From Swiss-Prot:
Protein encoded by which gene: Cdk12
Listed Polar residues bias regions: 251-275, 576-603, 1156-1167, 1189-1199, 1325-1336, 1444-1454
Compartmental location: Nucleus; Nucleus speckle
GO molecular function annotations of the record: ATP binding; cyclin binding; cyclin-dependent protein serine/threonine kinase activity; protein kinase activity; protein kinase binding; protein serine kinase activity; RNA polymerase II CTD heptapeptide repeat kinase activity
Biased composition (Pro residues): 524-570, 666-681, 1264-1277
Subunit and interaction comment: Interacts with CCNL1 and CCNL2.
Organism field: Rattus norvegicus (Rat)
GO cellular component terms, semicolon-separated: cyclin K-CDK12 complex; cyclin/CDK positive transcription elongation factor complex; nuclear cyclin-dependent protein kinase holoenzyme complex; nuclear speck; nucleus
Protein name (database record): Cyclin-dependent kinase 12
Length: 1484
């Protein structure tokens, strides 16, 4: 058996592996003859084998060619072994592994065969080599026995080893029998292949190899079949291989081996006869490689395999390498190993291509292929294509191949001599090395075997010996390759094996030794290769129980030269290690394959690194010592152990150098990330821990981060000290947000701090999510994360002391919530279009990337001063897969923006949830406040139901499936009244809002559809003028909250009264139809006429904040009674110190107002007079608005501080005037009473004072600090004053106000929100719009209310007084309007509660505005509508509800209480729901 094995092995090595094809070998030629023929005709046999492969499957050849790249890649991973023809080598390696397991002598023979190969007289040399190989096989078997396991055990392992991990002794006998069977089958196959090529038959003749392989093949067969199935080109070879294996282990292996051999590119290249056949073999080899698991099994299967493998596998590493079954046999028998070596060149060449794929393997194969090439050029010709790819991809490998060739030639000579001598007698060094390599390899594999037992047999065998390391490399590569490309791998291995066998016989032997040494060294620290080899050997024994191979240890000393080469191995192992992961049996086989293939690919450093890396990867318990796994990687790198054999030390070094170049190659795979192959990807990681890996890692990581535009700087490497912290701008779920400036660039950034102190689980999941998602989102409407920095100078400090790190974002000046709540800005319809367009574009982008934001709200929508919108805060975002049905949490999205399906418990939601949130924001942009404000889920659903209708199966069929449908039903069924409530917004916007707030998520429009809506489709952002945002103040949520708290604490109290008044209005609106219904009450604006006084108060919101209700009342009385009120008087009344500028402005205003008053007396068109007035007062500031607006400009003329006060007063006066008429305006300016109706203009005036009229109104007023409250004038005074004012206003003003109210268009949205709101509330009331939050206000009205909140707050008393005076004295439309006015005021006072107020909009004097407008409308005849308007205003002017309430309640109650008790109750109702009651009017 050993002999047949050897024959088979030799045949594999020379004929089977080499591909020496002796057609005359016939199935039944004597093994020795055939072996000789094979040896001599190894190349021919290869070519014939290739032809046979072609015969077997023309597809195989073509596929081999086609699959070549893949195979090459796989081979590259295995190529790194040592052969330029990695494919052949890999198949050969596998075979060699088997052979190694079978015989070290086989290995020696292979080496000799390699020498012969190098001698271009392959036939003669191979014949002699065959004889020598036969002898060597015998001696090799003895060697194996000496090594500590007989060839038989190797054979047995080969036979059953891959399939089962049997004891070496039992396996030896088995392998003998199997070898005989295999030999017969091989012979039969060869005779069958005879037609194709005698060389094939000769290959068959060495059935002993195949026999040995047959078990291996059996084990391989599944893989090979698998591989074959994977790669069709292998299908012939693979099929025959698999079939043979399946049919009869012996024969199948033989035939398979033979087929593999035939197919093996090695045989083809040796044959040199056919490049296509070579390709076929390549495919086959790929297949074989696929079966690499088999070779692995074999390796791991038998200790003898290990021992023999040590020398054989080194020489037979080629066979091991070649995926072909015979390749395994090679591993089993020395001869096969040798031929495998000669074949190897072809394999190597394929491997070279493969190398290009996998740097580690590439390197190995290139150096090995060099040796092989010198041995067998003919094969190379066929392999040439593979080589070229290898060369092109691995130029270093070419040089290394040349060196290897030279070394192989030298080794071949030595091998020839050694071969002639008994394998044991081989030059002691070489022989010893081979032996030692085999033994050591066996040791490791044995240990691995023991651990891995049957399943890991392949892997174990691979690891069995350093020689086996070659096989392991082959196997690992094969496995990896199998994983990557099963058939191509086989072919590559077969080719590589064949090619390398003749040329690399010596190389194989040397490689075995080297592999042994390097493996040993690799196993321990690769660095200590020369001296450490024994240590590694010792270490491997722990891995591999067989320490017996002490001779290998001496060999290792002989191999000291090898250790230096081994470091390259070590480096190569890294590559192998990478490959390893992909291999089916990663532990053992991977280790060895890593070791073998990687040395070539990676330099010693790399090898060392890879060894270290490999160790972690190698899970084999048999490889307990860390060094051992590296060794295996080294072996794998040495997968072309031929290179690593005793002669190969120098070659190995050369390979190492080349591998260094190959090391560079691994970098390319890095870029893809795992593109070359899973091994490659792992390789970078494995290498990463070591020196080279680090280099690779940065390259990998940087590009990754570069995806996030961070290519320039590595994330996490900078310290937060690089930034100057300017201030805190927000608070998030896991830290604060700071405004900062980059010290280097001067760029403003936002730093989001993430604390790790209190994190039980380390890094906060929300931060991880945000980082991960933001790196994938690059869009102009999505906030850009620039980098990540830490608060430590050194990353090591971060580990010691858990600090914080910061996400660095581009800085945005404002967020939408801060702007809306500030009242500093009024957005026009164009601005809203621009904002919504950008918002929906960003959301559509996220949804198309399959991300749900799940937290869209105003505070997460950022703006800069140029009007650019960005979506921020992706801490709750997640990847959305429409196909997966897994549930998500429904506790997402802030309650006010949460869609009904989440409120009802839906857990399988869609991107429609984000569209609902954006619909809420669209409504909020028009109403200036959240449209659904509740603090409980049930209450939120109630608010949604009131506006959008109750969820029911009629409109939402799937609602009945939701978990909480029955438990959270609204108290009553509501019909959908969204269109009525929002009738004041443009129809296109209303349509869009209607679609976005559809209850049924399946019918709700998508983000993409919103962009195609009439409202947004024609929006051109580039042509949009940026909104006039406050550049002096960054409006963020945190700032807004602080401001709100301040108002509530003291400033707000005064501010609140106006808010209360406005709230009253809002409340009344709410009462009518809680906030939402209030809009239908628009008729109430008539009372607003009488209430213009309150309107004025709202205009005076800021001043009102400063003044008491009584003071406001006095001021209103004064203003009303005295048309020629001097600024000093006003200042005194208000207890305000006015600067000269303010006084001048006020005087100018008064004059203009008086003029206007006269004009208004003459003309009922307050509009015309108002423009005059505005021109007179503040032409520059005046905006082209209705009279009220113009008045506002006047107010705006006033300086900032006094401006605010004057603006409040003037806005009140002007508002009153505008609504009332020119005369009324004059009266209003001088008298608060008349101003009540004109309150809208007054408010604008205040705005103008604080800021440009448009922007200033509400927002600037809030900034205005409330002055000392003026002495409260007695209510009677107010009444008297009011009477005087009404007298002035009576006919003309009333008419003007009525006209204004009836003609809301008179107040263009353009004018300040106050004016707008005052008039518009009336308009809307008249229209019976459901102006909820805005209530009466149109878009402008809402803006007005927002702006007026402060005015309202500051002048609630004034407004009420004005309204009262106006009502009483004016007798506008009659006592009804008078009463209506009082009522609305009364209601305002009583209804508004600071708690109910929305502080965000307290400044907005909507209520006042609505009141102002309402008195007129009320005159027209709807006290209810007045109340509604008030309610709306109240909601908006929550800030000053308290003050307004007190003032208005006191004053208003006196004369307004009796008038309309109805208004009050209405307001009460409205007031209670101002927030939640009105869907739109809910205070923020």
């Amino acid at each position: 058996m050993p002999n047949s094995e050897r024959h088979g092995g030799k045949k594999d090595g020379s004929g089977g592996a080499s591909g020496t094809s002796q057609p005359s070998s016939g199935g039944g030629s004597s093994n020795s003859r055939e072996r000789h023929r094979l040896v001599s005709k190894h190349k021919r046999h290869k070519s014939k084998h290739s032809k046979d492969m072609g015969l077997v499957t023309p597809e195989a050849a073509s596929l081999g060619t086609i699959i070549k790249p893949l195979v090459e890649y796989d081979d590259i991973s295995s190529d790194s072994d040592t052969f330029s023809d990695d494919m052949a080598f890999k198949s050969d390696r596998r075979e060699n592994d088997e052979r190694r397991g079978t015989d070290r002598s086989d290995r020696l023979h292979r080496h000799r065969h390699h020498q012969h190969r190098r001698s271009r007289d392959l036939l003669k040399t191979k014949q002699t080599e065959k004889e020598k190989n036969q002898e060597v096989s015998k001696s090799g078997s003895m060697k194996d026995r000496l090594s500590g396991s007989s060839k038989r055990s190797v054979e047995g392992n080969d036979d059953y080893g891959k399939a089962q991990l049997s004891k070496s002794s039992s396996k030896e006998s088995r392998s003998s029998k199997m070898h005989k069977e295999k030999t017969r089958k091989e012979r039969e196959l060869k005779s069958g292949h005879k037609d194709r090529s005698k060389s094939h038959r000769k290959r068959e003749t060495p059935k002993s190899y195949k026999t040995v392989d047959s078990p291996k093949r059996r084990s391989r067969s599944p893989h090979r079949k698998w591989s074959d199935s994977s790669k069709q080109d292998d299908s012939p070879s693979g099929a025959s291989y698999g079939q043979d294996y399946d049919l009869s282990p012996p024969r199948s292996h033989t035939s398979s081996n033979y087929d593999s051999y035939k197919k093996s590119p090695g045989s083809t290249s040796r044959r040199q006869s056919i490049s296509p056949p070579y390709k076929e073999p390549s495919a086959y080899q790929s297949s074989t490689r696929s079966p690499s698991p088999y070779s692995r099994r074999q390796r791991s299967v038998s200790p003898y395999s290990r021992r023999r493998s040590s020398s054989y596998e080194r020489s037979g590493s080629y066979s091991g390498r070649s995926p072909s079954p015979y390749g395994r046999r090679r591993s089993s028998s020395p001869f096969l190993s040798k031929r495998s070596l000669s074949r190897s060149p072809i394999s190597s060449r394929k491997s070279m291509k493969s190398r290009s794929r996998s740097p580690a393997y590439s390197r190995h194969s290139s150096s090995h292929s060099k040796k092989k090439r010198s041995g067998s050029r003919s094969r190379h010709s066929s392999i040439s294509p593979v080589r070229l790819p290898l060369n092109s991809s691995l130029g270093a490998e070419l040089s290394r191949k040349k060196k290897e060739r030279a070394a192989a030639a030298a080794a071949a000579k030595l091998d020839g001599k050694e071969s002639k001598g008994s394998p044991i007698i081989l030059p002691k060094k070489e022989k010893f090395e081979v032996k030692e390599s085999g033994l050591e390899s066996k040791k490791l594999p044995r240990g691995i075997k023991s651990e891995k037992s049957t399943p890991d047999t392949e892997l174990v065998n691979v690891a069995h010996s350093n020689t086996e390391v070659k096989n392991c490399l082959d196997t690992g590569k094969v496995k990896l390759d199998e994983n990557l490309q099963k058939h191509p791998v086989k072919d590559l291995k077969a080719q590589g094996t064949k090619d390398t066998k003749p040329v690399a016989l010596k190389e194989v032997i040397v490689t075995s030794k080297e592999t042994e040494t390097s493996e040993k060294e690799a196993l321990p620290p690769l660095p200590t290769i020369t001296s450490p080899p024994p240590l590694p050997s010792t270490t491997p024994p722990p891995q591999t129980p067989p320490l017996p191979p002490l001779p290998p240890l001496p060999a290792v000393p002989l191999q000291p030269p090898l250790p230096p080469p081994q470091p390259p191995f070590s480096q190569v192992p890294v590559s192998n290690t990478s490959t390893l992961p992909s291999s089916p049996h990663p532990r053992t086989s991977t280790l060895s394959s890593q070791t073998n293939s990687q040395p070539l690919v990676q330099v010693s450093m790399k090898t060392q690194l890879s060894v270290t890396a490999a160790i972690p990867h190698l899970k084999t318990s048999t490889l307990p010592p860390l060094p051992l796994p590296p060794l295996l990687p080294g072996d794998d790198d040495m997968d072309s152990p031929k290179e690593m054999l005793p002669s190969k030390p120098a070659k190995k070094e050369k390979e190492q150098r080349t591998r260094h170049l190959l090391t560079d190659l691994p970098l390319p795979p890095e870029l893809p990330g795992g593109d070359p192959s899973p091994p490659d990807s792992p390789e970078p990681k494995a290498i990463t821990p070591p020196q080279q890996p680090y280099k690779k890692r940065p390259k990998i990581c940087c590009p990754r981060y570069g995806e996030r535009r961070q290519t320039e700087s590595d994330w996490g490497k900078r310290c937060v000290d690089k930034f100057d912290i300017i201030g805190i701008i927000g608070e998030g779920t896991y830290g604060q947000v700071y405004k900062a400036k980059d010290k280097d660039t001067g760029e403003l950034v936002a730093l989001k701090k993430v604390r790790l102190d209190n994190e039980k689980e380390g890094f906060p999941i929300t931060a991880i999510r945000e980082i991960k998602i933001l790196r994938q989102l690059v869009h102009q409407s999505v906030v850009n994360m620039k980098e990540i920095v830490t608060d430590k100078q050194d990353a090591l400090d971060f580990k010691k002391d858990k600090g914080a790190f910061y996400l660095v974002f581009e800085y945005m000046d404002h967020d939408l919530m801060g702007l809306l709540e500030s009242g500093l800005v009024h957005f026009s319809e164009d601005h809203i279009k621009s904002f919504m367009k950008q918002l929906m574009e960003g959301l559509d982008y996220c949804h198309k990337k399959n991300f749900l934001h799940r937290d869209i709200k105003c505070s997460n929508i950022l703006l800069n001063n140029s009007g650019q919108i960005k979506l921020a805060d992706f801490g709750l975002a997640r990847l959305y897969n429409s196909e997966e049905s897994r549930p998500y949490t429904n506790k997402v999205i802030t309650l006010w923006y949460r869609p009904p399906e989440l409120l009802l418990g839906e857990e399988r939601y869609t991107p429609a949830i984000d569209v609902w949130s954006c619909g809420c924001i669209l409504g909020e942009l028009f109403t200036k406040k959240p449209i659904f404000q509740a603090n409980l889920e049930l209450a939120q659903l109630e608010l949604i139901s009131r506006l959008c209708g109750s969820p029911c199966p009629a409109v939402w069929p799937d609602v009945i499936k939701l978990p909480y449908f029955n438990t959270m039903k609204p108290k009553k069924q509501y019909r959908r009244r969204l269109r009525e409530e929002f009738s004041f917004i443009p129809s296109a916007a209303l349509d869009l809002l209607d679609h976005m707030l559809t209850l049924d998520p399946s019918k709700r429009c998508t983000a993409e559809q919103t962009l195609q809506s009439d409202f947004l489709k024609d929006v051109e952002l580039s042509k949009m003028a940026p909104p006039d945002l406050p550049h002096w103040q960054d409006c963020h949520e945190l700032w807004s909250k602080k401001r709100r708290r301040q108002r509530q604490s003291g400033i707000v109290i005064e501010e609140q009264p106006p808010s209360k008044a406005s709230r009253k209005e809002t409340t009344s609106g709410t009462a009518a139809e809680p906030v939402k219904n209030s809009s239908p009450a628009p008729p109430q604006p008539a009372p607003v006429k009488a209430e213009p006084g309150p309107g004025d108060a709202v205009g005076l919101g800021d001043i009102t904040q400063q003044l008491n209700q009584s003071e406001l009342a006095v001021l209103l009385n004064l203003l009303q009674s005295q048309t020629d009120l001097s600024i000093p008087q006003m200042a005194q009344l208000l207890n305000i110190h006015s600067n000269p500028e303010m006084q001048q402005q006020l005087e100018a205003l008064n004059q203009s107002i008086s003029a206007l008053t006269e004009a208004s007396s003459q003309q009922q068109d307050s509009e015309s007079i108002a423009p005059e007035e505005s021109l007179k007062e503040v032409p520059s500031v005046s905006v082209v608005l209705p009279p009220a607006e113009q008045t506002t400009p006047e107010a705006s003329n006033t300086p900032a501080d006094m401006q605010n006060m004057l603006a409040v007063l003037l806005s009140q006066l002007m508002k009153t005037q505008e609504p009332a008429g020119n005369l009324e305006e004059n009266t209003s300016d001088k008298n608060s009473g008349p101003q009540g109706p004109r309150r809208t203009p007054t408010m604008p005036q205040e705005e103008a004072a604080a800021c440009p009229p448009h922007i200033l109104p509400p927002e600037k007023r809030p900034p205005e600090p409330p002055g000392p409250p003026p002495p409260p004038p007695p209510p009677p005074l107010v009444e008297g004053d009011l009477s005087s004012a009404p007298q002035e206003l009576n006919p003309a003003v009333t008419a003007a106000l009525l006209q204004l109210l009836s003609q809301p268009e008179a107040e263009p949205p353009g004018h300040l929100p106050h004016e707008h709101q005052a008039l518009r509330p009336m308009e809307y009331s008249t229209r019976s719009h459901p102006n909820r939050t805005y209530g009466n206000t149109d878009g402008p009205e809402t803006g007005f209310s927002a702006t007026d909140t402060d005015e309202r707050s500051s002048g609630p008393a004034l407004t009420e007084s004005l309204v009262q005076t106006l009502v009483k004295n004016r007798t506008f439309s009659g006592s009804v309007s008078h009463l209506g006015e009082s009522n609305s005021y009364q209601g305002t006072g009583s209804v508004q509660f600071p708690g109910d107020q929305d502080l965000r909009f307290t400044r907005v004097p909507l209520a006042l505005h609505s009141v102002v407008g309402q008195p007129f409308l009320k005159s027209e005849g709807n006290s209810n509508s007045v109340v509604h308007a008030e309610t709306k205003l109240q909601n908006y002017g929550e800030l000053g509800p308290g003050t307004t309430g007190a003032n208005s309640s006191g004053t208003t109650l006196q004369w307004g209480g009796p008038a309309q008790s109805f208004g009050k109750p209405y307001r009460g109702a409205a007031r209670v729901p101002p927030r939640g009651g009105r869907g739109r009017g809910v205070p923020y």
